[in-house]
Amino acid sequence: FNMVFLRIVLNFLVGFILVLAVMPKAIQYLKKLKFGQVEREEGLQSHKAKGGTPTMGGIVFILCAVVVVYILNFTSLNNPYIHLLTFSFVGFGLVGFIDDYLIVVRKTNDGLKPLYKYTLQSVVAIAFYILAKFFIPGFDTAISIPLLHIEIDIGWLYPILVYFMFTAGSNAVNLTDGLDGLATGLSMIAISVFVIFAISAVFRIPTTALSMLLASMILSNGRIKHLGP
């Protein structure tokens, strides 16, 4: 258990330091390319001053997280969990990239249309379930109740749960991302709880899965440093 915990902490620290080292240069480069946020005309007057704030910083967070997880867990690359979790991580990051890119190109605050965005999110969520079902050894439809060590097989409800876990979670972050630091703070609280739950089941959950979870915390902490208030 001590080695697993050390591995988790190492993933977090290395990733966090990497984000802090890379992000300043990335911000300068994004400013040079004029990849800035466009504020709505009907928005608050105080928000108008934020126009031009570099966007697409999520590219750095995701790349740093994935690089750290793969390098520090190179001995576990035969484990399908790490590739599956990376797929979902990068998949939703790609949806966000397309959304931001359209905002920059069009010079308006309208990125992907809601229907298109939800469709892409749905594709990633459904693909995740299909890949898990066919490539994860011993895949089943049981869910674990954290700390109580109780498992309940929910059968056909499982794919529905997975679908809404991804789509609802993604949109929840989007909705809270309107105020500086709000999505970051809430994400850190939620992810910290998941880390505690995962550590409580450390002997049943691959450490690569925990490492990917910590990669999310790298993203959240990096956002506090560079995008927070």
Language-model-detected regions and their locations in the chain:
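"…together with the soluble PPM/PP2C metallo-phosphatase catalytic core" -> "…together
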Residues: F1-Q37, E41-P229
